[in-house]
């Protein structure tokens, strides 16, 4: 059963009317409500606030990394463990084929349902997850395989055990290693891009975002609590943080914004997966046309330009 957000209440009501009209074979009513639905979708999704976009990024039905792996990859084989401590189910590493291109895919996975959410630690990786990702990238580099990374996390896990095992070092190590990895690296934010948890698999030749994804240094809830000591200020914090793709594109923090269905990726996973596939394959093709030195130099310049500004 479809899940509707608060601002989609009118759309939900019209959808129910369409179902009822179908049930009694009232085709005239179906056509009428179908037109109403199209208008309401255009009206609602044509003027979304930043907070509403955040809600879509966190939608419980939104496709996660594993959904895209199933839609995108052929002959996929999962890589487990960091060879040092344990396997982290919050980070997925698969080697397989995407559109005829051998690919190493790394993705953060939130999980569905109570048991699976707990298993995946709500998409918050531990250091062993980031070290597993590094292991996968090193393997990809050894065999000259492009890397696709799917970002979707509220943040790196801040627990005591994670800190004791070197959470900050694991993230920093990935930033360092990925910046010089000798294969094409593409990162795409598919949902939430939470702070260092996102950066740890976000260092790449190209960083893109889906239309209804977000990327932030802190969650709006955390920002609201710190700056205003008031959880009701979350919408204000969302706007102030500039976390939407259009904001980040304007500030040159991301390279591209990928289209997804107007009503969200959760309504049409296949179309969204195709957009990811096309972007990845086209990006790899363009990067392969460069020499290794040119590719690494371009990546270095892209990364060092982040945060640069001029005072007027």
Curated annotation (Swiss-Prot):
Gene Ontology BP annotations: fatty acid biosynthetic process; malonyl-CoA biosynthetic process
Catalysis performed (reactions): N(6)-carboxybiotinyl-L-lysyl-[protein] + acetyl-CoA = N(6)-biotinyl-L-lysyl-[protein] + malonyl-CoA
InterPro entries: Acetyl_CoA_COase_a_su, ClpP/crotonase-like_dom_sf, COA_CT_C
Coiled-coil portions: none
Principal place of residence: cytoplasm
EC number of this enzyme: 2.1.3.15
Keyword Coiled coil found: no
Protein location: Cytoplasm
Family indicated by similarity: Belongs to the AccA family.
Name the UniProt record assigns to this protein: Acetyl-coenzyme A carboxylase carboxyl transferase subunit alpha
Gene for this chain: accA
């Amino acid at each position: 059963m479809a899940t509707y957000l608060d601002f989609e209440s009118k759309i939900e009501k019209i959808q129910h009317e369409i179902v009822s009209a179908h049930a009694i074979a009232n085709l005239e009513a179906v056509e009428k409500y179908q037109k109403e639905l199209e208008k309401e979708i255009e009206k609602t999704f044509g003027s979304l606030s930043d907070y509403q976009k955040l809600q879509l990024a966190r939608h419980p039905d939104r496709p996660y990394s594993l959904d895209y792996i199933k839609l995108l990859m052929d002959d996929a084989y999962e890589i487990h463990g960091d060879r040092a401590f344990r396997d982290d189910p919050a980070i997925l590493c698969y080697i397989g084929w995407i559109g005829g291109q051998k690919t190493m895919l790394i993705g953060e996975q939130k999980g569905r349902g109570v048991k699976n959410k707990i298993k995946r630690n709500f998409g918050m990786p531990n250091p062993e997850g980031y070290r597993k990702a590094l292991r996968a990238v090193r393997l990809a580099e050894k065999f000259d395989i492009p890397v696709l990374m799917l970002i979707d996390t509220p943040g790196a896990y801040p627990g005591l055990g994670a800190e004791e095992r070197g959470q900050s070092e694991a993230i920093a190590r990935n930033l360092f290693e990925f910046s010089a990895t000798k294969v094409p690296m593409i990162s795409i934010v598919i949902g939430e891009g939470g702070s260092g948890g996102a950066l740890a698999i976000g260092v790449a030749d190209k960083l893109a975002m889906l239309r209804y994804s977000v990327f932030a240094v802190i969650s709006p809830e955390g920002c609201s609590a710190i700056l205003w000591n008031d959880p009701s200020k979350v919408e204000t914090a969302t706007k102030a943080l500039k976390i939407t793709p259009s904001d980040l594109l304007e500030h040159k923090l991301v390279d591209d914004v990928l289209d997804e269905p107007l009503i969200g990726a959760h309504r049409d996973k296949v179309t969204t997966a195709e957009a990811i596939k096309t972007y990845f394959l086209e990006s790899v093709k363009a990067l392969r046309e460069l020499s290794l030195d040119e590719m690494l130099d371009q990546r270095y310049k892209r990364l060092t330009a982040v945060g640069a500004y001029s005072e007027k």
